[in-house]
Amino acid sequence: MINDIFNILLPHFVLGGFIILLLVLSMVLSPRLYRYARIIAVVGISASVVCLSTVQTDPQYFGFRNSIMSDSYTLLFDFMILCCGFLVALLSKNLVKRHKRNAFTYFAILLTAIFGAINIVSANDFLTLLVSIELLGFSTYFLISVSKGYHSKEAAFKYLITSAVSTGIFLFGVSYLYGITGSLNFTTIYEYITQNETSLIYTISAIMIILGLASKLAVFPFANWVIDVYKGTETSVLAYLSTIPKLAMFGIICRLMVFPLSNSFEIVFVIAVLSLLTALWANTYAIREKNVKVILACSSSANASYALLTASLVSVYNLSTVIFYLICYVIMNIGVFAYLNMYGDEKSFDINAFKGIYHKNHGHTALYTILIIGLAGIPITSGFIAKIYLFTAIANSGLVFVPFLLGLLLLMVLALFYYLKILMPLFYECDKNTDAEKFNTNFSQKFVVGVSAIITVLLGVCPEMLIELCRFIAYNI
């Protein structure tokens, strides 16, 4: 038991300790000391990152009766989740300043969400996975509802309902799989599947499990919630929502597609159809939208669909491509929401409200432009390299997937229109009488936007080292 704690769970225990500390302080400290909440959260996440060095990864380590595991794959995803959590905590300065009474509670919930996310990636049975998903889901629900406005409460309620339905579908799939194999452990299920012929009920259960998990990625037909949630949520929470849950869900989906869910054509074909439908819905919806948050919600859904299709086509090359794509995506996304955090949550997010902002905020808007063109997949950014590798992986997976590839390519070209729609108003109205205001920024916002933009360009120019690391991790999963 002690070996399990030090070989796998020390980062989890450290994070859990800081969660308890924040909850205790929320009851005993005055709201006037709200500034210390962010400091404690940042220290807790940093300590957890340091403790990752104690995690055993070679060979794979299984603990607590094989219910959790660690390897280089889980270590990378844990590191990415914790880094995103660190940046989200930095961006939450203005939010907790407006909600001083709930500052300690807010950061306790944020750390709980991170705790749930890293447990999802480490899970090696469906019971541990379910508890971790619910921990992440309920924490996300409270983070969405942190604002006092009507739209925030509506967004949280819609997320809760969608999450409940998707969890039900996931549980049905797990129950069918348990009925077939007699186990909830990934390793045992994988051994059973490889030694026996798969049946129709197995295929149905696998599709239900993947669909239940993919709903958190806003995949069709559970995609509509993302519109209302993004529209009614604070930008610092959106920086969390667009990164940490997605990393956690892709982390476990990729592992499940390797084992215990064998790579059957029926499962992959259904995922391919859902991915294409998601991309079609997201890109066509975004074209007619004028709210920047909604456009980014659709962008998030579309980008997730590209990665989901590639993740289902199991191979070392494809898996490494998905990992590289996710790293590039979360860096760009968190930078974009850091810029919107500079802009201010109390302002209108209609694209026309951004007119002329470049002329009052040259440097910040230039960095924001780099991040948006990265999301669009334009050259000299990591987004371009990531999408090239992603679509190459799909093309190499067989002729049957070429129509899906062509469809996704056409939709990606279509997506350029709404990315340009975000950028063009920024450079309008060059006269000095423009209504645009100079941002009142803090160091945390500048740091996140600057670092995100720099990494986006660096990975676009020289991605080789990161790609090699991703291939090494994919090979050793």
Model features per residue range: what roles?
Residues 1-477:
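Alpha-helical transmembrane segments of multi-pass membrane proteins predominantly involved
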